[in-house]
Amino acid sequence: MAPRWLASLTAAPFTFSVALGAVPPAFALVPYAYVPQSTELEAAGLGIAQAASRLLRLGQAEDAARLAALTVQLLPADPRGWVLLAEAQLRSNQSKKASASLARAKQLDPRNAGIWFAEGSLALRDGQPQQAVGLLEQGLRLDGRNAGAHFDLGNAQLLLDNPQGALQAFERASGLRKGFWEAINNQGLVLYELGRRGEAIDRWRQALQINAKAAEPMLALAVALAATPPGQSEARQLASEALAIEPNYVLDAYQKEQLWGPRLRASAKTLLSHPDLKAAVDRANANASGSMETEEEPST
């Protein structure tokens, strides 16, 4: 149900009908201003927060941030408003403001695991994986069953060149959330770099069983299959389809952004240089933008 919006937090001044001469000219009329009760302010703040949440779901992050800022003005002691504001600021590329909002939320509710997770994700996005690990682990001590936090922790561990820690985190993530193909895919990324090619192939096939159109496990599987003659025909078919879905994967820099290790990237370069893939590679190069926004968001 849509929240009811208050037309105004202050009523218009009352209109007085005063006969001429009824009031001595020395006395000015003082208009009456309605001061809303705290319960009304709270209702207004929560209604605005709901509207901001809807705007976030619609992808209107900047408008959501403006409404969320009004929410925290009305409800400065409610950590939920600060978390909402931080999320809107983060999605509208206001990282520093988002960090400040999360810090305020944590002051108000230090045992809220979600706030620690959000700070960890922000640190990861800002290229601070070591800080992200500390924040995420603290949050997981409060709520150890958050699959997304384990996934972020795995990504941070990968960036810190800790493949075993990353693999463990990704396995926990997929164990906690059914159908979490992104976590299964990333297990494959780790296993391939560790030289466990067969296990990596199994993971990527599992990921494609969940999401048959996911470009990342499709191309990674193609790369792994191309290592032996029996798999080369399937590999070229999968690679062509993957590049049609997500052309950015033709770029080595984009693969690196998606946490592909050096072994997988080198193997991908070999596969994509095959003459049978020239047309697919040329199309991908023409359409590639290098932007991470076009790929499935959780896979980084």
Give each language-model segment a name:
Residues S53, E87, S121, N155, ...:
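Residue-level recognition of tetratricopeptide repeat
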Residues R205-Q209, A215, L219-L251, D276:
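TPR/TPR-like (Sel1-like) alpha-helical repeat modules
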